[in-house]
Amino acid sequence: IGVSHGEDGTVLIDDQFAPLTPKIQAAVAALGASPVKFLINTHWHGDHSGGNENFGKAGAVIMAHDNVRVRMATDQKTPFGEVKASPKVALPVITYAEGLKLHLNGEEVRVISVPPAHTDGDSVVHWTKSNVIHMGDLFFHKMSYPFVDRSSGGDVRGVIAAADKVLAMANDQTKIIPGHGAVASKADLQAYRDMLVAIVGKVEAAVKAGKSLEEVKAMKPADGFGVNPSGFITADRFVEMVYGTFKPA
């Protein structure tokens, strides 16, 4: 979650699951901030947009990529089960294809769309003055291998491209907020990007060599990168996602 506040109002980036709304509102108030005026969803998944209905009813203006509204407005099937359409009040009311800029609290906040990556509706949020970048689930920082939701139009090659885009925007003082894990640096993101390139390269080469999924998993191409092996997405699960990119079922 990212929060920016000041005389122009409070901006919240992502809102987790609905039951957490009171805790989020309390944390915002503890910062001395006014109630959330603007809410940006980095993508449609429920752990980032589940509080939309609550914040929408409380008067927040919700913004997201065009495809976030499309997916939230219709029933979706994911690797973790079916997700029912959200009520109207939970849907983004301002949507965009390429991104937008907010001029609030003395900041230019750039909301940047990226090509299909974690999903087909990912956004990066860049506070240019504060030198802070929120990447949503384009970046999983060490607590798990990344989740590439191919059922939502995701593509691991897009995750690498998004990392490259953010690396070009960042410097050594930039604070990078991942979708999961601790706040990171440009060096952390570079290591993540290099890990993805290495794993994807190994898996793609193995697919071209005719190896089966089980043979590729036995190669352990995702091991040795310092990622929590028992996280939300395990090494084997991530290899399956990458394998499916190059050899769809």
Please identify what each model-predicted range represents.
Residues S4, D14, V28, H43, ...:
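Divalent metal-coordination and catalytic microenvironments
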Residues E7-V11, P19-M63:
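Active-site metal-binding motif and surrounding structural segment of the metallo-beta-lactamase
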